[in-house]
Amino acid sequence: MRIISIVVLVITVSVLALTQGKTRDANQKTRVARETTSMRKQAKATFTLKSWDEKNYDEIGGTPKLTRVSATKSYKGDIDGEGNLEYLMMYRTAGSASFIGLERVTGSVGGRSGSFVLQHSGTFEGGVAKVTLSVVPGSGIGDLRGMSGEGGFEAGHQPPYAMTLDYGFE
């Protein structure tokens, strides 16, 4: 009977130690998540298009035209550097389009150097592009490793174009 009591005591102590360790780990993760969220910043920058190369890749009479765009951008401000962008666009009507894209930005954000990828989703109507941006998870390199964020811009035909990006690091 005494051996069974000792075994039960050892198991109970082991379970309590594991539970306390998991609770401590969970509390640590919660604290880090709060710090990461509270440390988010907003980057404000302007950009200009250095190049824009648009080509049709599918067009059948009477249907929306599909194009592919390769563009390069130059950033100034809290984001400083170059962007290489690929868009896929669908023109609904003349002067109206929907598009998606990926852009690798290389340079610095808030004084941290490296690169990251932005995912673009937008529309073009009445001469104005409205774009939402999100940092692709896991795309940060260098000092921008662990970067996350969302932002956007509205742009007409009057460069430079203003944009914002709310960002943080894990």
What are these regions (language model features)?
Residues M1-I4:
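Positively charged n-region of N-terminal signal peptides that target proteins for export
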Residues V13, Q20-K22, D53:
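Generic low-complexity, intrinsically disordered sequence content enriched
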